[in-house]
Amino acid sequence: GMITASLVQNSNFKNKYFSKYTDKNNTDWIRISLDASDQGKSPNGSSVRVELAQKTKWALKGTHSFTYTFFGNCSNASEAKFTVGQFLASKLPNANGKATDRPLCRIEAEQGKIVAKIRNYYEADKVDEINGDPIKIELGAWIPSKETTIKIQTEDKKLTIFRDGEKKESITFTEKVLSDERNYFKAGIYYQNKDSPQIFTEIFLKNLKIE
């Protein structure tokens, strides 16, 4: 199917790396699946991914939020590990001088649970062992067929995660995360372990809203 013009206008998202949408009966669900994502390759490694990326970028100054609803179908939910929404700092140089996006908050389906993983620094993945593991916030069980609504909210450097309207936890970014760096939101499937691409997964997204 084709994505509707109204959804394109209202969502403030552009598509990248994926080829399939469904919008049956004007429900405005967007389908993202392995059969779409296997056409792309992440520059961060060999993992396939699909994504909707925010067009405009924002800084931690002020209040910003990203809300979306999703459900899915997974052939092995107890083993699959993938990101289904996140925000990143845009194009910060690494030790080699190459500009790289830095994930600060990921919402992941992780072996039957939904978790938030938060980095309180900009370091690249390869040096995480030096700087410590991300902060992990458990958001409850992941039942693929059940609709789940996630809200990621920032108020200056205070980050709060909501699930289905319930506040789960807040953390405050340290001085290592700067207020004036530009950030952006993404939604999609980003596999987090080598076995997940062999597990059939499809996610349906709707009501994507940035404020």
Regions found by a protein language model. Name each.
Residues 162-167:
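Short strand-turn-strand beta-turns centered on an Asx-Gly dipeptide
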Residues 68, 145-154, 159-161:
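Short tryptophan-centered beta-strand motifs in secreted/extracellular beta-sheet-rich domains
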Residues 60-62, 140-144, 153:
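Short, contiguous, pocket-lining structural segments
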Residues 8-117:
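Secretory/extracellular carbohydrate-interaction modules
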Residues 116-149:
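Short, aromatic/His-centered strand-loop micro-motif at the edge of beta-sheets
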Residues 36-46, 91-99, 121-130, 169, ...:
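Short, surface-exposed beta-strand/loop "edge" segments at domain boundaries and coil↔beta transitions
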